[in-house]
């Protein structure tokens, strides 16, 4: 006798913003490849499923969205991710710093200001140790200093700063 299958969760994922490095602890493999699907089409698809969920009165259905693997979005993508988060009843206000390409000076200040104007109120950094230890785990020299400099600049602008520090015994060989 056939059984009815009722889905409870839909997850949509788009590799839109390539990662500038590959962390040794990351679960997303080969994250430098970018999907050929434009973000605007991805957003339309997800909105159609939200509309379907509403029309079918499927309050029991959870729709999850991930656009990554880094949050190095252009402003239009950032606004689109915010629209998708609003459909879930949330706000997209904190930007994760992992995997961003390195910017400096006026370019970094302008990048930060563009995000502040677009509604980002703070930044989050996941740090795998201090200084060179973090850099080794993340596969990019200077990454620890880069992420902490963005947090400092954000704090100077009155923005929220969030840090997560991973504590573990270092098992990486010295290079």
Which ranges hold each PLM region?
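Canonical Radical SAM [4Fe-4S] cluster-binding loop centered on the CxxxCxxC motif
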Residues: 1-44
């Amino acid at each position: 006798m056939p059984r009815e299958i009722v889905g409870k969760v839909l997850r949509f994922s788009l590799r839109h913003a390539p990662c500038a490095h590959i962390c040794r602890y990351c679960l997303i493999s080969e994250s430098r490849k970018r999907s050929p699907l434009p973000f605007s089409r991805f957003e339309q698809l997800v909105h159609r499923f939200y509309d379907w969920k509403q029309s079918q009165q499927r309050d029991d259905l959870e729709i999850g969205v991930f656009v990554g693997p880094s949050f190095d979005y252009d402003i239009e993508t950032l606004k689109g991710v915010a629209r998708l988060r609003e459909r879930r009843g949330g706000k997209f206000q904190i930007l994760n710093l992992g995997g961003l390409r390195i910017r400096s000076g006026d370019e970094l200040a302008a990048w930060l200001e563009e995000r502040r104007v677009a509604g980002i109120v703070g930044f989050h950094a996941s740090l795998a140790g201090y200084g060179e230890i973090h850099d080794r785990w993340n596969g990019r020299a200077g990454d620890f200093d880069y992420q902490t400099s963005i947090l400092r600049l954000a704090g100077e602008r009155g923005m929220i700063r969030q840090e997560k520090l991973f504590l573990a015994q270092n098992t990486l060989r010295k290079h």
